[in-house]
C-alpha cells in the first residue's frame, strides 16, 4: 500500500508533500508512523479556498520547491481530482472511473501505486 510507495519514493529522493483537506491529517500520519516520509504537510486552515480549488496543491508544490507542472497528485475524491487538474499537476486517482472520471490514470487501491507505475503515467502524459 501507501507505505511501500512512500519508502520507494524516499529511496529515490523524490519530494513528497501531503495536501489533505483533513484537519486530522497530521494526527493520522503520526498514528500510522509515516510523518517522517513527508517533506511538507500543508495545513488546510492556512488556505483561502479548499478543494476543488487548486490552492492546497499549489501550496504543496511550493513547500517542496517544485514547479506544479512537474508534480503528480494522488487523490481518492472527485473534488481533489478537480483541484489537481486546476493546479496543473498530473492527477492519479485511487478509485473508480464512476467516482473520479475516466480521463485520468486510475488504480483501484493504493497497493497498485509504485514508482514504476507513476513513471509510466508520467511518460504517457
Where are these regions (language model features)?
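Asp-based, Mg2+/Mn2+-dependent phosphohydrolase catalytic module
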Residues: 3, 7, 23-125
Amino acid at each position: 500500500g501507501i507505505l511501500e510507495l512512500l519508502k520507494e519514493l524516499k529511496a529515490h529522493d523524490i519530494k513528497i508533500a501531503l495536501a489533505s483537506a483533513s484537519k486530522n491529517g497530521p494526527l493520522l500520519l503520526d498514528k500510522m508512523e509515516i510523518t517522517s516520509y513527508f517533506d511538507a504537510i500543508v495545513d488546510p486552515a492556512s488556505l483561502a479556498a479548499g478543494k476543488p480549488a487548486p490552492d492546497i496543491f499549489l501550496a504543496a508544490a511550493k513547500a517542496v520547491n517544485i514547479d506544479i507542472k512537474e508534480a503528480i497528485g494522488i487523490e481518492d475524491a472527485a473534488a481533489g481530482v478537480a483541484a489537481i487538474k486546476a493546479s496543473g499537476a498530473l492527477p492519479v486517482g485511487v478509485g473508480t472511473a464512476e467516482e473520479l472520471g475516466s480521463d485520468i490514470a486510475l488504480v483501484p487501491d493504493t497497493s497498485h501505486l509504485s514508482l514504476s507505475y507513476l513513471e509510466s503515467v508520467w511518460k504517457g502524459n
